[in-house]
Swiss-Prot record:
The protein's enzyme class: oxidoreductase
Phylogenetic placement of the source organism: Bacteria, Pseudomonadati, Pseudomonadota, Alphaproteobacteria, Rickettsiales
One Pfam family here: QueF_N
Catalytic reaction(s) noted: 7-aminomethyl-7-carbaguanine + 2 NADP(+) = 7-cyano-7-deazaguanine + 2 NADPH + 3 H(+)
Source organism of this protein record: Rickettsia akari (strain Hartford)
Pathway note: tRNA modification; tRNA-queuosine biosynthesis
Name of the featured protein: NADPH-dependent 7-cyano-7-deazaguanine reductase
Main location, first listed in the record: cytoplasm
Chain sites annotated for binding substrate: V81, E82, S83, A218, E219
EC number: 1.7.1.13
Keywords, ordered alphabetically: Cytoplasm, NADP, Oxidoreductase, Queuosine biosynthesis
Molecular function GO labels: preQ1 synthase activity
């Protein structure tokens, strides 16, 4: 279905009964083709991590339950889920009676797997689970004194490097782009870990800032950045993790890595989540 038929950017009515058809799929292939990414031979592994903070249902006695969920959509899924449709879908459980939290978890995982055409994993937690705030790992480059005059479209010529091999981890909290349809801002903290030619931190920060007025979905921004770095420095290893702030009760955190046996970063929330 074309994106114009989705509920994104439109006035919506919240349904008071569970409805899996609310989930709206967006094929990954269109954006990947534009980036020169072969969907049958992806240059990365990883997941899109969806954290959901507005999750509720009713038990058999009519008593409401609330919780939070974390769901992992693999990068080799055929589709992603449009975020507003996911919000409306989750809220359709508000008056839905379930036997247990495990049943709710099973239903959601099955529905997400069906719409993405991949095996989605995840867990649902009670809200009294204690979670500490973390900080992005690596060296922060935001304090660099640079002059910026490009806020979009992203300029991959700014991904400059030095002819010296390094292994380093850098991060920035200055990433911002905008929803492709609504124009709402997506604020993100990004962590780049790589082994290869040394990125010039000042020009790379300018590159990240060049997304500021750009309109693209979060997952697609992540793959654009990953591709631009990979094409520029041809690293022996590269991983990218973006933690986006919460919008509509959901935050999306894409992770991409050249390492098939990757380990996910710490799941500690950052202060802006």
């Amino acid at each position: 279905m074309p994106l114009s038929t989705s509920l994104l950017g439109k006035t919506s009515t919240y349904k008071d009964s569970y409805d899996a058809t609310l989930l709206f799929k967006i094929p990954r292939i269109n954006n990947r083709n534009a980036l020169g990414i072969n969907s049958n031979n992806l240059p990365f592994y990883g997941v899109d991590i969806w954290n959901t903070y507005e999750l509720s249902c009713i038990n058999k006695k009519g008593k409401p339950w609330v919780g939070v969920g974390t769901f992992y959509i693999p990068t080799d899924s055929e589709n992603i889920v449009e975020s507003k449709s996911f919000k409306l879908y989750l809220n359709s459980f508000n008056n839905f009676v379930v036997e247990s939290v495990e049943e709710l978890e099973r239903i959601i995982l099955q529905d997400l797997s069906n719409v993405t055409h991949a095996k989605v994993t995840g867990r649902i937690f009670p809200i009294n689970t204690k979670i500490a705030f973390g900080v992005p790992s690596g060296k922060n480059i935001d304090a660099l004194d640079i002059v910026c005059n490009n806020y979009g479209p992203p300029d991959n010529s700014l991904v400059e490097y030095e002819e010296v091999l390094v292994e380093e981890e850098i991060n920035s909290n200055l990433l911002k782009s905008n929803c492709l349809v609504t124009g709402q801002p997506d604020w993100g903290s990004i962590v780049i870990k790589y082994k290869g030619k040394k990125l010039k931190h000042d020009s790379f920060l300018k590159y990240l800032i060049s997304f500021r007025n750009y309109h693209e979905f979060a997952e697609q921004c992540a793959e654009r950045i990953f591709t631009d770095i990979k094409n520029a420095i041809k690293p022996d290893f590269l991983s990218l993790y973006i933690v986006y702030t919460r919008r509509g009760g959901i935050d999306i955190c894409p992770y991409r890595s050249t390492d098939k046996s990757y380990s996910l970063p710490s799941d500690k929330r950052l202060i802006r989540q």
